[in-house]
Amino acid sequence: MKYEVFARIRAGDELIHVGNVDAPDDRLVKSYARTTFDEEDWDRMVAVPRDELIEVTGNQKAESPPRSTQ
């Protein structure tokens, strides 16, 4: 399953998207995310299953680019 990972460096800062990881379940995503994004001493890190993200703007499906008329 694909997870989107968000983190912050200091308490009180906003969470920022730091990337994504593939993990078989919620338990292992914690270890995978910590290992993958270990370049900072994060105050907080959260992982959200990509399928659980709610579309706020835009289309659900990516649109095809316009075709050339030439």
What feature does the model see in each segment?
Residues 28-35:
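Short amphipathic, charge-patterned alpha-helical segments
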Residues 15, 31, 55-57:
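Short acidic, gly/pro-rich beta-turn/loop elements at beta-sheet edges
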Residues 35-70:
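Short, mixed-charge low-complexity intrinsically disordered segments
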Residues 1-16:
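Short aromatic-glycine-(Arg/Gly/Cys) micro-motifs in beta-strand/loop hairpins
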Residues 16-24:
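A short, exposed loop/beta-hairpin motif centered on an aromatic-Gly-Thr core
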Residues 12, 21, 57-59:
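Compositionally biased, intrinsically disordered low-complexity segments
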Residues 6, 22, 48:
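Residues in well-ordered beta-strands of folded domains
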Residues 26-27, 53:
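Short, charged/polar surface micro-motifs in flexible loops or helix N-caps
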